[in-house]
Amino acid sequence: MTAPPADLDAALTGLARVPTLLVALDFDGVLAPIVADPSTSRPLPGSAAAIRALAELPGTTVVLVSGRALGDLRAVAGFGAPVRLVGSHGGEFDDGPLVLTDEQRAAKEALERAARGVVDGEPGVRLEDKPAGVVVHVRGADPAVAERVLDAARTGPARLPGVAATEGKAVLEMAVVQVSKGLAIDTLRGRLGADAVLFAGDDVTDETAFARLGPGDVGIKVGDGDTAAAHRVGTLEDVTQVLEELLAARRR
């Protein structure tokens, strides 16, 4: 698209006028394409440039809010300060490590054992370890294998005491702390005293963030699928255009 739709353009214009603005963005499928090897994913150059410029503006905080582990997100995103990072669907903030209680550590060990029993020997499936839990990835698996593994994870480790499950596109994350992108948005808004929030996401896990937006905020769904977001764009290039429009409006 050459410019955001009229309703989104008007929303961005209003958003640009607030004194304290939080710009929160998912990474994969929003800033960077989803690829077979997640370690090779990088943000589109235009989006990266707009993010860096926005983050330098007074009263403007840009935060990447991703399902990736914080260290993984830092490695692929390529941003330093003042751009902020939140990983593990809000389970890891870049201002300090996540500390588990003894009970949570024991629950995580039990979760890891149960999850390993589900994925071991399954072709195209991998288990990712995170500070507060594990993630079952099935993007590389045959559809029948993927569904079998996800069903086993849903009915097994995901139901262990103290475990909260979050399902996304070809992934099932299980954690021993309650996390969501919606809670992360609430936390960031409170810490920053933000007058308004822009959030853009593409996955079902982003819907908790869209649900936390209120009057004056702007939610943008990237791609297809049901959503609570008020606005939608089709491609990552459209996201670049949105960020550039917001940057230009906030500089005025």
Spans of features found by a protein language model:
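Non-catalytic pre-domain segments flanking phosphatase-related domains
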Residues: 1-27, 31-35, 46, 189-190, ...
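Mg2+-dependent phosphoryl-transfer enzymes with acidic/Ser/Thr/Gly-rich catalytic loops
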Residues: 1-5, 18, 182-252
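Active-site phosphate-binding/coordination module
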Residues: 42-130
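Substrate-recognition "cap/lid" segment bordering the active-site pocket of phosphatases
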Residues: 86-113, 166-194
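Short amphipathic alpha-helices in soluble, non-transmembrane regions
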Residues: 111-115, 148-157
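Histidine/lysine/aspartate-rich catalytic loop segments that bind and position anionic ligands
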Residues: 133, 151-172
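A short secondary-structure junction motif
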Residues: 135-146
